[in-house]
Design a protein with these regions (language model features):
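N-terminal hydrophobic/helix-forming segments and targeting peptides
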Residues: 1-441
């Protein structure tokens, strides 16, 4: 990259860090993205209206997933260009009845969300985020632990002096899921002579300060996420360390590409999806029909059939891949690994074992991606998710391609993926943006 490109990359990543800090959950990501879209002139989509080239619309799916689109110069019948990333990340979700007291300390019970190494979530500062729906239907947004002066929370761990039994266990067994309980208080309510005085004190505080009663947990989506901010990493500031790179490091570039591409040849359809980390199910996941329904509305406006639009469309499934880590190089096949600072990584297939659970892009789709990226001088590489039979993973590509849409995975290589603090290179983030601009152009 030239000095000019590097400066552009570093400048671009300042906006990305701001986005990351504002969007630690899928709901916050949608709220932040909608504000960005409306500022850029996007309006809510109305399926009863007719749109023309250059019109910019968005569809908010339950506040947890989002579609943004810019109508292209060509008819929708000739296909659309789809970019999709997911905005959910591994975290600790609160159980429906989370609040309890033990040993005169108050805790919240959790059920971890997504694939985590449980031991990584102990003894780090956590913030509480989410939405509470009260009995009367009113809603309350919660974010405690992010602002200067806010309290933070944590999952405690066993001191090494008493951990002989624990340390004989495997890493997977050392911290049990049922022990990922969040410490939230220890001060008993004064003058209370009843049982569970600390829990009563915390319940009183929740009501007085936040208007939450214990029963409200039954109709809430609350989770614990790392309380730290996105930070430049390395003396050269070439990297970013943060929670939630997977997959907001792709969500932000495709959103910015959508906003910045003012007059695309083909209609651009940008999706920020939920539930990828748990299988893409539910109405806000890519295994639902909300993408198909949106394209069907576009097809109806153009007087064509949705299946014909899908067959003529292409999708870049923007999801991360595992960057080569020299400290753990034995799990990678180096000739087919992705590396930080080598640009956006195009992943033909994911899956496990014999490519189980993968989209496996066609040779024609790979050639299509090559032509687009090379034509715009985008820095790119190919990569697999580790050695054969080492493990595996999946993306939303398989759920898009089931609609007969040619799809390939493309995204940012990540170090320490799924950890509370993941690492990416700024150059790769910017090249992902440039790849999506080239695709939408």
């Amino acid at each position: 990259m030239s000095e000019e490109e590097l400066k552009a990359a570093y400048d671009f990543c300042e906006g990305y860090k701001t986005f990351l800090d504002a969007a630690k959950t899928e709901r916050e990501a949608v709220t932040t993205a909608v504000a960005m879209l409306e500022k850029a002139g996007y309006v809510p989509f109305d399926h009863a209206k007719q749109y023309k080239a250059g019109d910019k619309v968005y569809l908010n799916n339950r506040g947890k997933a989002l579609i943004a689109a810019t109508l292209g110069r060509r008819s929708v019948a000739e296909g659309v260009r789809i970019g999709v990333a997911h905005i959910d990340s591994p975290r600790l979700d609160l159980k429906p009845r989370p609040l309890y007291e033990e040993g005169e300390q108050c805790f919240l019970k959790t059920h971890y969300y997504g694939g985590i190494k449980k031991y990584q979530w102990t003894a780090i500062p956590l913030a509480l985020h989410g939405t509470v729906i009260r009995k009367d239907g009113s809603s309350l947004s919660v974010a405690i632990g992010e602002e200067e002066g806010d309290p933070v929370f944590c999952v405690t761990d066993l001191l090494p002096h008493l951990a002989a039994d624990q340390m004989r266990k495997t890493l997977a067994e050392g911290i049990e899921g049922e022990k990922l309980n969040i410490l939230i208080g220890s001060a008993a309510l004064r003058d209370d002579t009843g049982a569970e005085k600390v829990k009563v004190a915390i319940a009183k505080l929740l009501f007085e300060k936040y208007g939450i009663v214990e029963e409200d947990f039954l109709s809430a989506e609350l989770c614990a996420v790392p309380a730290f901010k996105a930070r430049d990493l390395g003396l050269d500031r070439s990297m970013i360390g943060a929670y939630g790179h997977d997959d907001r490091v792709c969500a932000y570039p495709i959103l910015m590409a959508e906003i910045d591409e003012k007059s695309p040849e083909y209609t651009s359809v940008t999706i920020l999806a939920d539930k990828e980390e748990t299988g893409s199910n539910g109405p806000t996941g890519m295994n639902s029909y909300f993408l198909k329904d949106f394209i069907e509305d576009l097809a109806d406006m153009a007087g064509c059939k949705v299946r014909h639009v899908a067959a003529n469309s292409h999708c870049f499934s923007a999801d991360v891949n595992a960057a080569f880590d020299p400290i753990y190089g034995e799990v990678h096949e180096r000739r087919n690994a992705s590396y930080i600072n080598y640009g956006v990584v195009v992943t033909k297939y994911t899956g496990a074992r014999g490519k189980a659970g993968t989209n496996d892009a066609t040779a024609e789709m790979m050639g299509f991606a090559r032509r687009i990226l090379d034509a715009e001088h985008v820095g790119w590489q190919t990569g697999e998710l580790g050695k054969v039979d080492q493990g595996g993973g999946g993306t939303v590509a398989m759920y898009v391609s089931q609609h007969n849409i040619d799809t390939v995975d493309l995204g940012v290589p990540v170090l320490s993926m799924h950890a509370p603090f993941e690492v990416v290179a700024k150059a790769d983030v910017y090249m992902t943006y440039r790849a999506m601009r080239a695709f939408y152009k």
